[in-house]
C-alpha cells in the first residue's frame, strides 16, 4: 500500500490495459445503455458515432476495472469529486491503456491524518487519441 507521502507529483504512471471485444461492448450496452450505436454495427455505421462503440458508462467501468487490478494501491479514504470527459469513442478490439498523473497534493487542514491528492487520469486507445480523461480529488491516508 502507498500513502499520501508516496505520491510523486508530475510522474506519469501506466496503470494497466484492457481490450474490450465487440461482444463485451454489446453485452454491457444491452443491460445498461441500449442505444443502437452500442448494439448494432449497421445502425452504428449510420449514426453520428460512425461505427459500433462502447457506452461512456462502459468506458468509465473499464477504467475502474483496470484501476482495480493495479499492483500498487493508494490508501484512499474517500473520493471528493471528479470531472470526466469522453472525447473519442471506444471501438471493439482496440487496446486501452489507463495512465495517471498526480497534479497536486496537500495535507488536509481539517483532518491531519489524510492528504488531498488531485490527479488527471486518461484512457488512451492504442495508436490513437484519449477516449476518456478525468480529474479527480480524493483523500489519501498519511503514513502512520
Predicted feature descriptions by range:
Residues 1-9, 86, 90-144:
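HotDog/MaoC-like acyl-thioester-processing domains
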Residues 1-81, 143:
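Hot-dog-fold acyl-thioester-processing enzymes
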Amino acid at each position: 500500500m502507498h500513502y499520501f507521502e508516496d505520491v510523486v507529483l508530475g510522474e506519469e504512471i501506466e496503470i494497466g490495459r484492457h481490450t474490450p471485444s465487440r461482444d463485451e461492448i454489446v453485452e454491457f450496452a444491452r443491460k445498461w445503455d441500449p442505444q443502437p450505436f452500442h448494439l448494432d454495427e449497421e445502425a452504428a455505421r449510420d449514426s453520428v458515432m460512425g461505427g459500433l462503440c462502447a457506452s461512456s458508462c462502459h468506458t468509465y467501468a473499464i477504467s475502474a476495472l483496470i484501476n482495480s487490478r493495479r499492483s500498487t494501491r493508494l490508501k484512499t479514504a474517500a473520493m471528493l469529486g471528479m470531472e470526466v470527459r469522453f472525447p473519442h469513442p471506444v471501438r471493439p478490439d482496440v487496446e486501452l491503456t489507463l495512465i495517471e498523473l498526480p497534479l497536486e497534493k496537500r495535507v488536509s487542514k481539517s483532518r491531519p491524518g489524510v492528504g488531498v491528492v488531485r490527479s488527471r487520469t486518461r484512457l488512451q486507445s492504442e495508436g490513437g487519441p484519449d477516449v476518456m480523461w478525468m480529474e479527480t480529488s480524493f483523500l489519501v491516508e498519511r503514513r502512520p
